[in-house]
Amino acid sequence: MNGDDLARELRDDHETEFSRLGSSKAMYALTGGDMDGDSVRAAAATDALAFAEVLEGWSGTDTTAALHSDLAAAARDYATAVDDDPSLDEEPLLYDELAGFDTAPARLGGLLGRYLVVSEYASQMVGFFVGDADPTAAADFRELRSELDAEHDRVVDTLDSACATANEWAAARDAAETVIDAAYDDYVGT
């Protein structure tokens, strides 16, 4: 097993969930039904701030502390890049789940699940701004999506070095599935 294999398996095993999380209905749910540019930006910023808070809340004692710190800083930068005045009004459900992991394999698996989910959201956000005839915002979100893809790759690489046993890979997989399921449950419940 390696991180790329795990990501592929998760995508295959959760094809329906990812299909729905990558739909315009998911964007509607993320924005609370307000389908305008400001609401899409606010939803992206809220997601990024919630993610940063989780990462900052994890103790610095495990071997992935530098990764957590880098990703938290990038998430805060992302929030301010997409919204002039980002705020964390209501935390998406997946971050409650993500915050509860306490081992490096579980945290990394949870991060992988989060990046798989947010990749779907980011694609919808690009599509929203293309459809809204806002090429500047669409280009900004494409660039941010590329940054998310690079962060995803970094998580995959870190998984490869952190998971040496079948039990560690199982913990990573379970955590990723928990995060994916939480995002999907949040979508269905909205």
Describe each region flagged by the PLM.
Residues N2-T190:
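Non-heme di-metal
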